[in-house]
């Protein structure tokens, strides 16, 4: 049993209110769920988790179920890239994703998945550079509980082009994600 909200109140007294997000992935006890609710901190939603057959693909991970007060990802540094996920995940999970997203193959799956979270009500979305670039498993950042090749991926000079920046800006305009000062995270 930790200090609960007393810890966050003490931190706020010392350094003021901060934008904090809670990593609420994995097993959550009722007391942790209550602490998250009491704190008002946004939790995390991972689109890849929506298709995970090992846990029934909880509906809370489908973008239409995201509350505004959350941070949405396709996957985090601990997951495979969107493109890599299509070959590393269970085939039935990939099929579920294709069916849900309305696609028949992995062509542009990174953009399709990013658009799904951008179209959600999540106040904040974060995408991996590797997903913006359409990279596969070879660029995965971290594989939890392993040693050796984690945290080695580096962007190469010139990979972030003006064309990519224009495409991202167009997507942000399309989904109303530019200059949203009214949105608190």
What do these predicted regions represent?
Residues 1-185:
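Catalytic cores of glycan-processing enzymes that make or break glycosidic bonds
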């Amino acid at each position: 049993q930790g200090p609960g909200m007393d810890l966050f109140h003490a931190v706020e007294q010392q350094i003021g209110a901060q934008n904090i997000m809670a990593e609420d992935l994995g097993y959550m006890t009722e007391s942790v769920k209550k602490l998250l609710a009491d704190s008002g901190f946004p939790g995390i939603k991972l689109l890849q988790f929506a298709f995970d057959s090992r846990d029934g693909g909880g509906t809370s991970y489908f973008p239409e179920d995201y509350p505004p007060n959350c941070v949405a990802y396709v996957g985090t540094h601990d997951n495979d890239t969107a493109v890599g996920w299509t070959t590393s995940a269970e085939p039935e999970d990939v099929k579920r994703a294709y069916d849900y997203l309305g696609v028949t193959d992995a062509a542009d799956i990174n953009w399709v998945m990013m658009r799904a979270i951008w179209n959600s009500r999540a106040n904040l979305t974060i995408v991996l550079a590797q997903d913006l670039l359409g990279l596969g498993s070879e660029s995965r950042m971290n594989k939890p509980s392993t040693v050796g090749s984690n945290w080695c991926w580096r962007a190469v000079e010139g990979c972030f082009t003006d064309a990519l920046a224009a495409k991202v800006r167009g997507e942000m305009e399309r989904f109303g994600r530019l200059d949203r000062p009214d949105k608190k995270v």
